[in-house]
């Protein structure tokens, strides 16, 4: 099998992980690289009426998901995996790439990284 290795140095955050204070607590060595949008995806809440709902993404032609790109260390990825409940199978890591623009002039470029996507077949807690 010839699977492409996922770049786990760049994390694309959406939803609550766009909160910089929250990210700083969860991933103290993460550095904000810039912002962008992932084209042809949309945000989707999944959950139960009486309980929590969880944010995920899914393909949707013409839609866009706003993201922040962070440079992360293995320890940050470990904390994110726990927060996103990867060990139980709620979310999985998927590769993604998009153009990211930072705060400096001419500081835009396409970065390959990863984000978390909810598994469709997973029962919600």
Features from the language model and the residues they span:
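Glycine-aromatic micro-motifs
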Residues: 2-125
